[in-house]
Amino acid sequence: QMLGSIEMECRNQGFGMMLVCSYGRKDEETTGIKRLRELGVSGIIIMCVHDENYSESILEMAVQHFPVVTIDRRLKGVPISFVGTDSEAASRELARYLLDRGYRKTCFVKPHAAETSTLQERIQGFKKAYNEYGLFADESLWITDIRATLPAYHQYRGEQQLAEDEEKIIEFIQKHPEIDSYFAVEYSLARIVYTCLRKLGLQEKCPVVCFDGSDNIVQESMFTHVKQDEKEIGSLSVRILADEIRGDDEVKTVL
C-alpha cells in the first residue's frame, strides 16, 4: 500500500519514480543511493536498513541539503525529514490492550537486528505500559534473535533459516510455560510465533498481537494489531519531498 501510494503521488506531482531495493544490506543501500544520484534524481525517499549506524551516503545527503525523506525509521540527530508512526505511543497502547485483559507474562518478540530508533520506541512504549500498571517487563521472557524476517537472511537462507527460527521458538515456548501472550514488533514475526504455538496446541491459549497486518481484499487480520496508515505515509512523504525539491529547506517530522 505504501509503495503504491508513493507511485500515485509521484504521478500527481509530475514526477517519475525509480525503485531500488537494498534487501536489508547497508552496502546495497549505499550503492543504491550512489547509483540514483549518478542518474540525476531530484530527491530520494528511503526506508533505511536496520543498523545502529547510519549510512555515510545518507549523512552526506543531509550535509549537502539534498532533498530526502525517510519513512519507517527516524534518524535521530540528523536533519532529514521523516514521515511515520508514533511507535512509542502505538506500542504502549498495544501493550495496554493485553494488560487490560489480564495478561502479565508477555513475550516481546523482535528480530535479530540493531535497535533502530523505531524498534527502541516500540520497546520503550511496551515498558512504559508495564510501568503504568506498576509492573516490570521481564526481559528474560523476550525472544530477540529471530533472523528469518530480515531481508538478508530471507534472501539467502530462506526456508532453512525459517526452520531454525521455528525450532528455536518452540524450544523457548516449552522452556517458559509461564508466558501467557506474545507481542511481535512486526506481522511476519507474529505469523512465525503463531505457527509455533499451533504446533504445540497453544494457539487458543496465548494471544498474539503485532504491528501491521496482512493486506487482503476484505481487510481481515489474524491478530489484534496496530494498523499504520501506509497510504497516507507514502503520499505525504512524496508531498514533503516535492516541497524540498522546490526549495523548502524546513526539516519536517510527521507522526
Segments (PLM) and residue ranges:
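Short acidic capping loops at alpha-helix termini that bridge into adjacent secondary structure
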Residues: 105, 137-140, 201-208
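Short beta-strand elements in bilobed, periplasmic/extracellular small-molecule ligand-binding domains
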Residues: 11-21, 127-160
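Alpha-helix capping/helix-boundary segments
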Residues: 51, 114, 122, 188-190
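Alpha-helical recognition/docking segments in bacterial nutrient-uptake
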Residues: 1-96, 100, 174-178, 188
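Secondary-structure junction motif
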Residues: 108-128, 149-153
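Flexible loop/turn connectors
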Residues: 170-255
